[in-house]
């Protein structure tokens, strides 16, 4: 059951209640929500740079966490999250929603069938078009201080897809770039 919604913008949380057909109490203060609503787990869907603080607070309250990717934007934040997981014996799971688009699920199924043979290497390119790419650069994502960078915010989807499709972790990675 949904026991609470927490957002710095209460109107947005009320709108979410309306969209979901729920009547969960709305909070603007995370500490208060954790203390009063006492959730079993929280879903973190905030600006990327805020994830670590929210995750650690929830873990320190004994609450498991499901977070949007990326989990954190800095290495020291990752250390803090891992330490909070260990200290509190709680878990953090990361959501990668690109896995669930029909085309990506189809690729996953095709790769598991014997029809394609064994994959021995991957060359993955992603091109931002004017529709999605332009929109990305108008929102908060464009600010490295809030998203960690285009690489961290966007490319994590693609690294996850390749790992998921192949059921493997990379052995070797190369990158090429140009500012021209």
Residue spans for each PLM region:
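Predominantly a Rossmann-like dinucleotide-binding segment in NAD(P)-dependent oxidoreductases
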Residues: 91, 98-180
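Short alpha-helical segment
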Residues: 32-33
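Beta-strand-loop-alpha-helix segment that lines the small-molecule cofactor/substrate pocket
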Residues: 36, 41, 47-48, 52-99, ...
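N-terminal Rossmann-like dinucleotide-binding module
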Residues: 1-21
């Amino acid at each position: 059951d949904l026991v609470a919604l927490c957002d710095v913008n209460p109107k947005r949380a009320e709108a979410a209640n309306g969209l979901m057909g729920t009547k969960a109490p709305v909070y603007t203060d995370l500490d208060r929500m954790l203390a009063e609503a006492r959730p079993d787990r929280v879903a973190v869907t905030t600006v990327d740079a805020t994830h670590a603080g929210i995750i650690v607070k929830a873990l320190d309250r004994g609450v498991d966490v499901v977070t949007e990717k990326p989990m954190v934007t800095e290495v020291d934040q990752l250390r803090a999250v891992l330490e909070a997981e260990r200290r509190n014996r709680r878990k953090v799971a990361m959501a990668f929603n690109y896995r669930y688009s029909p085309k990506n699920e189809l690729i996953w199924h095709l790769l598991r069938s014997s029809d394609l043979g064994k994959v021995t290497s991957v060359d993955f390119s992603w091109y931002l078009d004017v529709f999605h790419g332009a929109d990305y650069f108008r929102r908060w994502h464009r600010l490295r201080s809030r998203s960690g960078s285009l690489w961290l915010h966007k490319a994590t989807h693609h690294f996850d897809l390749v790992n998921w499709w192949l059921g493997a972790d990379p052995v070797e990675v190369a990158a090429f770039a140009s500012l021209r």
